Design a protein with these regions (language model features):
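A short, structural micro-pattern
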Residues: 101-104, 210, 263
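Structural beta-sheet core signal
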Residues: 42-44, 70, 158, 214-218, ...
Length: 270
């Protein structure tokens, strides 16, 4: 949840300049991890200190001789007791910062510092508030979403054409679901990784029930792989000279055109 998704997003965006390798264990898994134990640190994060998945993974992966850091609340919880037993480093999580916002607390900022990033640069709220374009975009986005809800469109579907943003939208999914899913109300956030999902759920999006609204997301990847033109057969010669980013953009435009023809509401960010 909030104890890892924000941090994963930070790492994904900055990993080209981060000199350390980070492995995120955010679920119960049977897979074995290949880490250099003598050169690794276990960072165990849980606000409550009693999250079952974190407790189980801690039992499987960490040992007393490891370098261990625990981030949890300062109360009578399981992970705090374990940290004391292991004589591990302990960072107390401030209990007035909720899980949805914890990326700006020690939960997100300590990992950011370990990545070699400056935590202070993540806290630029004042500059955002003073940015009229940001505020206007925020108001416009909220207004359009409320309009969709009034028209009984409760499924917010992200059509994501940017591989680097996958963790960002997993985080978005968690934030929207936990923030708005209350009192029998809310939005159902669904993330589709495109263009792969053209061959799975797109049929439902186009011709299924009509309580969805869509958001396209695309970024132009400057270092995109270029196809080997000499190996493209003549039947698909339109692909010659194209790179992956060109192709994905063309597919995005094509999908938007289809939604327009079917009068299906969407917004698009590039």
């Amino acid at each position: 949840g909030g104890s890892t998704l924000g941090t994963q997003t930070i790492y994904e965006f900055f990993k080209d300049i981060v000199k350390k390798d980070f492995v995120f264990i955010d679920n119960l898994t049977q897979k074995k991890l290949n880490t250099k134990k003598n050169r690794s640190v276990n960072l165990v994060v849980s606000k409550s200190g009693n999250t079952i998945e974190t407790v189980v993974n801690s039992n499987i992966y960490i040992r007393r001789k490891d370098a261990n850091i625990f981030i949890t609340e300062n109360n009578d919880n399981y992970l705090l007791k374990l940290a004391n037993k292991l004589k591990a480093e302990i960072v107390h999580h401030n209990n007035y910062i909720g899980g949805r916002y914890s990326v700006l607390s020690e939960v997100g900022m300590l990992p950011a510092e370990l990545m070699g990033l400056d935590a202070n640069k993540f806290r630029q709220l004042n500059s955002l508030i003073k940015n009229k374009h940001f505020i206007n975009s925020l108001v416009s986005g909220v207004s359009s979403t409320l309009n969709y809800i009034k028209n009984k469109k409760y499924n917010s579907i992200i059509l994501n054409y940017d591989e680097k943003s996958e963790n960002l939208f997993k985080w978005y999914q968690q934030l929207v679901a936990e923030s708005l899913g209350k009192k029998s109300k809310g939005l159902l956030p669904i993330v589709s990784n495109m263009p792969k999902d053209n061959h799975s759920v797109m049929q439902l999006y186009l011709d299924g029930f009509k309580n969805n609204f869509y958001t396209f997301f695309y970024t132009n990847e400057l270092k995109s792989e270029t196809l080997k033109s000499s190996q493209i057969l003549s039947s698909q010669k339109f692909l010659r000279g194209k790179n992956l980013s060109n192709i994905m953009y063309a597919q995005k435009i094509g999908t938007e055109n289809i939604l327009n023809k079917k009068k299906i509401p969407f917004r698009s960010f590039e």
